[in-house]
Amino acid sequence: MELFPEKRILTVSQLTSLIRGVLEENFEHVWVEGEVSNLAMPASGHLYFTLKDAGAQIRCVMFRASARALKFRPRDGMGLIVRGRITVYEQRGDYQFLVEYLEPRGVGALQLAFIQLKEKLAKEGLFAEEHKRPIPSLPQRIGVVTSATGAAIHDILNVLNRRFANVEVLIRPVKVQGEGAADEIAEAIIDFNRYGAVDVMIVGRGGGSLEDLWAFNEEKVARAVHRSRIPIISAVGHEIDFTIADFVADLRAPTPSAAAELVVKSKEELASKVEFLRHRLIQTLRRILADAGGELESLSRALRDPTVLLGHLSQRLDDIFVRLERAIAGDLKDRGRMLEALKNHLRLRNPALKVERARERVIALSDKSEIALLRHVDRYREAAAVHSARLETLSPLGTLARGYSVALKLPERVPVKTFRQLALKDRLELLFHHGRAWCRVESLDEDASCSHE
């Protein structure tokens, strides 16, 4: 009998392989909850991190194909729920958790991705009001980006036809959910800006779950909406649904039907607005006519009493003469003071030569002063004559003196400006430069150029 039974001796590789088989067979689909730490994402695209709790930790790896499908970005300190399997990395003798799927703890992955992208774009200013373009009040051509087979396009067309059938609609059919939907929506927005020549766009779809609406939460769609030169109305889902596209768009409509109602006014609304503007125009014209009538009445009152106008003109002429007299008197005083100063200067300096020269200067200055004074007087007289002639020309009495007359319609004594104020048998008072006469209208003739022989 052998003291020691036969021993089975394993190599390190064999032992590691056995351990790997046991772990991978028994831990093939496992859900694990923990907190992320040591997160790394190298150029390879793989995701490396440690999942830990208060008592232990495990290394995790998520290969690039799975990592690219993530809707959100994990961060250190974030709580995760992961699904995967245990594998052994034989070269180091380590075991690790190969993650196939993960989601944030306490909130869905899509909801977290929505929050993260919303915060990112808000910081970049994509939601700012200064970027919002005004929606045209009466567009001629409307572009629609939605599914060609969904209920949304039928709702939009029905509303547009009911409210304003003359508007032209260009439809760009796209996928609105599933793989590639975001790419098609963004491309359609870009194409409308490049070729569509539309006045406004409606981008949207009918209701659905968060997953169904997710294409409108993609960053590429948000940036296409932001870069659009054409105003965009976002109409995704129902009234309670909000997407990233809603925040970036120039206007958010709760439903596709509401978007159609916002983009065009009904014929009744337009007719009501036209009637409102017509009423305002009539009021404005009436106010202008009333103001003009008041001014005309003021002028008419002034013409009825020409003595008032003559009185004002006479006062102006009196003021001119008073200023003229003061100017002449002041100039004479100045010249007199100058002569007196020269005399005093001569008295102080008595040599005969200086006296003679001073006398000659005094005579010369006196002559110049007299000439200048006469010139001033002549200019003031000429100015007074000109003003007097102008006043005479402006005077209604002067007009009468030149052979004209003024016709007043009796009994109101209203000045007659046109024959249309007259009727047969009307009594008139004619004012002449000297005297007045009364007459009666026997006939009327519209042609002012005709003469009676």
Curated annotation (Swiss-Prot):
Keywords linked to the UniProt accession: Cytoplasm, Exonuclease, Hydrolase, Nuclease
Pfam families attached to this UniProt entry: Exonuc_VII_L, tRNA_anti_2
Keyword Protease applies: no
EC class (word): hydrolase
EC nos: 3.1.11.6
Metal-binding in keyword set: no
Name recorded for this polypeptide: Exodeoxyribonuclease 7 large subunit
